[in-house]
Amino acid sequence: MEHIKTLIIGSGPAGYTAAIYAGRADLKPVLYAGLQPGGQLTTTTIVENFPGYPNGVDGNQMMMDMREQAERFGTEMRDGSITHIEFENRPYRVEDEDGKAFTTDTIIIATGATAKYLGLEDEEKYKGQGVSACATCDGFFYRKRTVAVVGGGDTACEEALYLASLAKKVYMIVRKPFLRAAEIMQQRVKEKENIEILFETNTKGLFGDNGVEGAHLVRHLGEPNEEAFDIAIDGFFLAIGHKPNTELFKGHIDLDEQGFIKVVPGTATTNLPGIFAAGDVADPIYRQGVVAAGSGAKAAIEADRYLQKL
């Protein structure tokens, strides 16, 4: 049976950076790219907040650059996903989706987190053309424009406040008749003059010839006073949470109440020896490419130190 020193599950900034560091440490890493090679950044039209690209860079191109750099240092790239891990014994026995089995001394988990969407057909149609799940990433493109934020929790309020500092007008589309955010966040939102909260409102669709130009909304859905109306917007931001891709690890690796992998603070170390986590899968707070890359570097360094003690 094949044996490898370091297995990296998932690509994106965390996985590829871990691969670069692991390759340079001669760990001969094998990286499984997963269902979306390159991760969420491959759907981002332009990335302007990652160091080293003064004029910005296409998200897909940046991931291709990282992949090429990882390959240069000896990373073996494999398509597909890991479907099974035997956590009870070491070295860990692993199987991929094609049934190929092998063992590994260390595992770096970089499977990411998936933004939750409403499930509208239009969301996919306009993704990267007005639809976003990251105000910090894309808010700059909507300076002096009108945007909408979907959600009523802390994340939605944070996104709305951030966008309000850039945009001319921010609508908050809230399904319930109240906000679920902390009281201080609610107060800040309500005090912001360019934020308008649309309570008891659902999004039915988006429209526009060249990207998002507006949203079809319904107030009091399913009630006698149901009312359909449209708003003109340039950007549509989802802020209804992220789902970490941790199904494979449940019951074995410690997760928090949201399903994110718990790591020892300041490290990439999980509760299992030789298993490390990097990127959004272990980050319920920041979810930024540059942060993910840094955590990927930490995971690879820790994997190297772990192997040196074997």
Regions found by a protein language model. Give the residues of each.
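Short beta-strand/turn micro-motifs composed of small residues
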Residues: 10, 33, 111, 151, ...
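FAD-site-proximal beta/loop scaffold in flavoenzymes
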Residues: 119, 125-141, 240-291, 295, ...
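Residue-level detector of alpha-helix initiation sites
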Residues: 12-13, 36, 113-115, 154-155, ...
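Beta1-alpha1 glycine-rich phosphate/pyrophosphate-binding loop at the start
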Residues: 2-73, 157-183, 256
